[in-house]
Amino acid sequence: MEQNTEKFSIFNSQFSILTSYFPDLTDRQKEQYAALYDLYTDWNAKINVISRKDIENLYPHHVLHSLGITHMLRFKPGSSVMDLGTGGGFPGIPLAILFPETHFHLVDSIGKKIKVGQAVAEAIGLENVSFRHCRGEEEKQLFDFVVSRAVMPLADLVKIVRKNIKKEQINALPNGLICLKGGELAHEILPFRNRAISKIGR
């Protein structure tokens, strides 16, 4: 009983942070985000998709970090986005909840991680997502944007996803790659210094 009370307290404090950043969430979106805590906690006990030391920080370190992309761009209805190296569904699933009229295609080379993402998406009733177990080099579809959370050096990532970017633009920003990375990036982004680069606090 005491353990359940502590778990609820952790969830409640973290979830309130999420809703403070996104006060206009619909009831449906709140339900979907709220369900992520138990779903990922349960799945993480079977398949390690999030550091077991970090699962209690699911909302600030994973959900909100994924939604940091909205600091740069709000996807227009009808947009298509590939999440490369999604792992258990980040940033794709949190973004798919927030943008129900955008399609998200989640790709990972590790099948068991895709299995977790599919199970979570099905459990919360996400209808604007698809999944594929493959390497990025194998995915040939075209998208408005590719998003990724630090799966590899930026130069390598650009080489892989360049083929996947549509030419026709419908969003406020030009089509391209949105990469969530931390640490010292000056050397890594130097070859792309003339591209749009924005710092997003975590």
Give the predicted meaning of each segment.
Residues 85:
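Conserved glycine-centered beta->alpha loop in an early N-terminal alpha/beta scaffold
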